[in-house]
Amino acid sequence: MFRSIRSWSAIALFALMLAACGGDKKGDEESSGETQAACTRSALGAAPDLPKGWPDLSEVTYTLQTEQGPTTVVEGYFDGSLETAHDDFKRELEAAGFTILFDEIEEDDSEVSWKGKGRSGQVALREECGSDDKIFVHVTNRPA
């Protein structure tokens, strides 16, 4: 009898573990919809709220801006490849006097973490606009 209880307990525990590993499809769909909006909207009507001296890359179009507490999030797209976007942001941030805290480029995404002018944040770049030559841009900008 105890062996049967232990077996059923093990099966129940395994089922719970599998259920806990399931992804949140709704969250993924919402994120994808927000990304597509940033990739397809028109440019912001005013300059985005980024630190003074922020590089003005001609290939970047900022389309969305939101406030999340003390953090400003600016999104849009980069006309060009992921590698070019990564290299341009890193180079131009350094040239504008920002310190690069960390940068990484992978097959489908990239990050450049920065600090300067009393602010810090990250430029996240992802191949999620539907083509290899249009890259989703997500910039976080918060007090340092």
Language-model-detected regions and their locations in the chain:
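An acidic-aromatic pocket/loop used at catalytic or ligand-binding sites
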Residues: F2-I11, A15-M17, G22-A144
